[in-house]
């Protein structure tokens, strides 16, 4: 028996009876009672994430491993920030609440009289690197990767495969960091577990690891960077937002999550620097954090009025050998940019055709309800675990299917983004923008055509998706924006994105080279897309329970 043969092993501290069981609680409790009678030195639980957490902690468990601490309103009982759409409204906290770094799970674990361990955090899909196919020289053959690669080729996107991999990989790391730090910020939290650090090529292909299936690095994060937010001691910045106006006072609390072997009494050095290096502030705080505690070291209060142009700032926190970073964006507090000579439209109609034929500059922001069949939903975080599996589960449960996208992809140096600092992939300033969008399916465009701002699709569909794209139509110039600019007008980043877009359209740089006839444009917006049948693998968990 396991307890008899391994009970004395120094690493044997905890035992659970399985993973995501739909267990008969009385039977499992009886088993644990027998185990304790045989060896009471260990900590026992009924299993990991049994009943998907809906039934909450049970008498007889020493600790509780779960994604949620029983049922509750919204996300009040969640101890993980990301879910499948079938399991939490809009995929959970990270996708559906405005990004901030000052929240934690204190409210959720208050419902539990024993330690809570977060279950299978950080399941963010990353687009695959198809060069790994060559590694499969044994009995396993990567038919799945070959199929996905062929689908990409069908839509003339093969040249972007490596870029897709890098962009989605770098964005997934930001989501890893946010998910983990939610746990580290929570006083009294029992910890969290990842499913693994590597891809899981089974169950429909869950490519969610920072390592590939061979345990090789994907090259998306340096070990020292990962260690900065997943270590025995983690410096934490507590901010109410990532996006600020230069008229707002910046307040940041600095905390430490201390799980080293002793108390931590060391200085915390901080620096806040703009990407161009012109604006810089720094300082030192003194930390005194008891072992096993999450405590504040002090705060940072600054004026941002010296930043007259849109800037990304990087905050670095260093104490001893531990270093962590944060990005925030500061935008000038200005009145909304005028449309000027740009004509704004919501539908394709005869008036719009005539304007384009006569040489007008047109901004088309399609009414989202009118293009559902030609687009996919707006989503911020990378799709959870595996699209085909949870698409099927959602449909069978009668619940919303995830939009299934992975990240934006753009050229940060393009003049469209001159006044909206960004990297090539999604980051926190894109949250409201992507959530209020419907990326257009552009498979019917010329094979080599690329949108100005693209969205990386999942491996099952591999659509060419456009968030912002442009065409020359007749004598006119057309820019199509699949983002509801009105919906994001009240946010610092939304107003700034609109400003950058309109300034581009009013400049000489706005000169589309991709010619499209009106008939082709009309077909793009009114032809239903032939969708590939996607059948997910069977999963035994019951996603029809719960209240979300």
Task: Give each language-model segment a name.
Residues 248-288, 297-303, 310-319:
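Beta-strand-rich binding/interaction modules
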Residues 88-103, 371, 391-492, 509-547:
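Catalytic beta-strand/loop cores that center a nucleophilic Ser/Cys/Thr
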Residues 24-27, 54-55, 365, 370-376, ...:
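Extracytoplasmic/secreted cell-surface and envelope-processing proteins
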Residues 38, 195-259, 266-268, 529-532:
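Aromatic-rich peripheral "rim/lid" segments of glycoside hydrolase catalytic domains that contact
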Residues 320-325:
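Short, exposed coil/turn segments at beta-strand boundaries within extracellular/luminal domains
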Residues 340-388, 475-477, 481, 501:
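Short alpha-beta junction capping motif
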């Amino acid at each position: 028996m396991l307890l008899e043969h391994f009970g004395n092993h120094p690493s044997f501290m905890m035992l659970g009876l399985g993973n995501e069981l739909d267990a008969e609680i009385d039977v499992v409790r009886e088993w644990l009672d027998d185990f304790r009678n045989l060896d009471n030195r260990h900590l026992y639980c009924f299993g990991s994430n049994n009943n998907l957490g809906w039934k909450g902690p049970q008498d007889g468990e020493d600790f509780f491993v779960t994604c949620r601490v029983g049922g509750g309103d919204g996300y009040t009982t969640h101890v993980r920030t990301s879910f499948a759409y079938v399991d939490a409204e809009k995929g959970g906290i990270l996708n559906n609440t405005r990004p901030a770094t000052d929240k934690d799970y204190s409210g959720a674990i208050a419902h539990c009289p024993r330690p809570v361990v977060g279950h299978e955090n950080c399941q963010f899909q990353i687009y695959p690197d198809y060069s790994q196919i060559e590694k499969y020289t044994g009995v396993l053959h990567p038919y799945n990767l070959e199929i996905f690669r062929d689908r990409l080729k069908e839509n003339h996107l093969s040249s972007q495969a490596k870029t897709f991999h890098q962009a989605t990989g770098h964005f997934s790391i930001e989501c890893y960091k946010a998910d983990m730090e939610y746990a580290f910020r929570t006083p009294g939290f029992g910890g969290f577990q990842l499913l693994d650090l590597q891809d899981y090529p089974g169950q429909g292909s869950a490519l969610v690891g920072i390592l590939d299936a061979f345990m090789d690095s994907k090259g998306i994060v340096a070990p020292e960077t990962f260690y900065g937010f997943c270590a025995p001691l983690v410096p934490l910045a507590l901010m109410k937002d990532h996006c600020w106006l230069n008229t707002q006072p910046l307040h940041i609390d600095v905390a430490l999550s201390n799980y080293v072997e002793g108390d931590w009494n060391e200085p915390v050095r901080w620096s806040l620097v703009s990407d161009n290096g012109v604006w810089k502030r720094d300082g030192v705080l003194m930390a005194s954090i008891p072992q096993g505690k999450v405590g504040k070291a002090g705060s940072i209060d600054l004026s941002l009025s010296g930043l007259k142009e849109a800037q990304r700032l990087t905050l670095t926190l260093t104490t001893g050998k531990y270093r962590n970073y944060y990005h925030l964006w500061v935008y000038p507090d200005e009145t909304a940019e005028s449309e000027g000579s740009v004509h704004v439209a919501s539908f394709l109609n005869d008036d719009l055709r005539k304007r384009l034929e006569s040489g007008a500059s047109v901004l088309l922001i399609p009414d989202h309800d009118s293009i559902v069949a030609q687009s996919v939903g707006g989503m911020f975080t990378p799709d959870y675990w595996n699209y085909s599996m949870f698409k099927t589960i959602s449909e069978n449960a009668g619940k919303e299917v995830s939009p299934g996208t992975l990240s934006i992809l753009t050229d940060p140096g393009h003049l469209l983004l001159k006044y909206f600092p960004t990297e090539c992939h999604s980051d926190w300033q894109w949250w409201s923008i992507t959530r209020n969008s419907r990326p257009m399916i552009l498979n019917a465009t010329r094979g080599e055509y690329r949108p100005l701002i693209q969205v990386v699709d999942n491996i099952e569909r591999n659509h060419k998706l456009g968030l912002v794209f442009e065409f020359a139509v007749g004598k006119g110039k057309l820019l199509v924006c699949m983002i509801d600019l009105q919906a994001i007008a009240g946010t610092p980043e939304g107003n700034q994105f609109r400003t950058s877009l309109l300034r581009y359209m009013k400049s000489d740089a706005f000169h589309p080279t991709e010619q499209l006839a009106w008939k082709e444009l009309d077909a793009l917006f009114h032809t239903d897309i032939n969708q590939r049948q996607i059948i997910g693998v069977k999963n035994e968990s019951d996603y029809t329970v719960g209240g979300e």
